[in-house]
């Protein structure tokens, strides 16, 4: 995505689901989630071993659960799916996103992670795709105030 597209997406986005949001505060996914919450985003945790809540928010065990009609009735549509999974898992994640009834506008894959197949799957389905890019660092860069 070009900078203007990222900026527009981040300005309009309200709900960010984070796949792989660890309850461990030392993990990058948790640091990013806390930052996004501080910026006013509603973060929806998705973690396979979720047990109740992460960061005071209801945690979901799977994409299907987080993107279900019941879950979305609480928050509305999910704008961005931020993915913290290994590059090898991204194709399966993209295929899973395609099977969702309620799809995100964007799949954002964290810094150091990339998969051409996943990118093609999402883009061919009309879903924005950003990879090898930290949403926290991009938000800071795009919206930092210069004196």
Give the location of each predicted region.
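Short phosphate-binding/catalytic loops that engage adenosine nucleotides
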Residues: 41, 102, 127
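Short N-terminal or domain-adjacent regulatory/targeting segments
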Residues: 1-12
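Short, acidic/turn-prone active-site loops that include or flank metal/cofactor-
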Residues: 48-49, 65-66, 110-114, 133-138
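NAD(P)-binding Rossmann-fold cofactor-contacting core
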Residues: 26, 34-55
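Glycine-rich, highly charged phosphate/nucleotide-binding loops
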Residues: 1-2, 54-76, 82-94
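ADP-ribose/adenylate-binding Rossmann-like module
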Residues: 100-122
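Conserved beta-strand elements of the Class I
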Residues: 16-19
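Active-site capping/gating segments
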Residues: 126-147
């Amino acid at each position: 995505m070009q900078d203007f597209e990222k900026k527009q997406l981040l300005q309009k986005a309200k709900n960010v689901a984070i796949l792989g949001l660890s309850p461990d505060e030392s993990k990058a996914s948790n640091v990013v989630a806390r930052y996004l919450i501080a910026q006013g985003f509603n973060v929806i945790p998705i973690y396979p071993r979720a047990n109740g809540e992460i960061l005071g928010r209801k945690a979901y065990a799977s994409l299907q659960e987080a993107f279900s009609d019941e879950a979305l009735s609480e928050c509305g549509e999910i704008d961005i799916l931020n993915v913290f999974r290994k590059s090898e898992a991204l194709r399966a994640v993209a295929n899973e996103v395609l099977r969702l009834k309620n799809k995100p506008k964007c799949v954002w894959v964290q810094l150091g992670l990339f998969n051409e197949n996943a990118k093609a799957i999402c883009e061919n389905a009309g879903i924005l795709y950003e990879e090898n890019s930290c949403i926290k660092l991009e938000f800071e860069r795009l919206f930092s105030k210069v004196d």
